[in-house]
Swiss-Prot record:
UniProt entry tagged with the keyword Hydrolase: no
UniProt note: domains: The cysteine framework is III (CC-C-C-CC).
Keyword terms, alphabetized: Disulfide bond, Secreted, Toxin
Tissue-specificity statement: Expressed by the venom duct.
Record has Amino-acid biosynthesis as a keyword: no
Principal location class: secreted
Subcellular location: Secreted
Organism name: Conus natalis
Protein name, as recorded: Conotoxin nt3a
GO cellular component: extracellular region
Disulfide bonding pattern of the chain: C2-C11, C3-C15, C7-C16
Signal peptide: none
Amino acid sequence: GCCRFPCPDSCRSLCC
């Protein structure tokens, strides 16, 4: 699954 919005910097490269 993807990160929540707004997504944290640590997840931004994964799904944002």
